[in-house]
Design a protein with these regions (language model features):
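Active-site-adjacent betaalpha module
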Residues: 1-133
């Protein structure tokens, strides 16, 4: 995100940093999509706090990782109990695209599928070549 301003912060819980929260609020959006390393700390802490404040928070579980499988899974359980939604990257991409007739972002989504979704991305590329689209 080269055009994004870096926010220098000291809080472990990002959502405790007023500068971060103000930047998010300024977007006017009501839904947060969060993923990151150390699911049990860097993801769970802001998710639980933001959900508690009434934000619609979704955690992308397969784009997050904890120090162990157990800590990742326990953090996910905590976030669900706090009111967060969970989904995978592929589910998120599908919900955002919804209809392949919506062509405005198909090229970008196709690149993401090819680069990051292994066999699914290759299958999609192959299908597009067969359909000559």
């Amino acid at each position: 995100f080269p055009d994004q301003e870096v926010i220098d912060r000291t809080w472990v819980n990002t959502w405790q940093d007023e500068n971060v929260v103000n930047v998010v609020k300024a977007t006017g959006r009501k839904q947060l999509i969060i993923a990151g390393l150390w699911t049990e700390v860097c993801v769970a802490m802001p998710v639980i706090q933001a959900a508690g404040e009434g934000w619609d928070v979704t955690v992308i579980t397969d784009a997050s990782g904890g120090i162990s499988k157990e800590s990742h899974e326990v953090a996910i359980q905590r976030m669900i109990a706090a009111g967060a939604n969970v989904m995978t990257v592929m589910a998120l991409a599908g919900e955002w695209q919804r209809d392949w007739a919506r062509t405005e972002h198909v090229e970008e989504l196709t690149e993401i599928l090819i680069q990051h979704f292994g066999g699914s991305g290759i299958a999609y590329l192959w299908e597009q070549q067969l359909l000559n689209t």
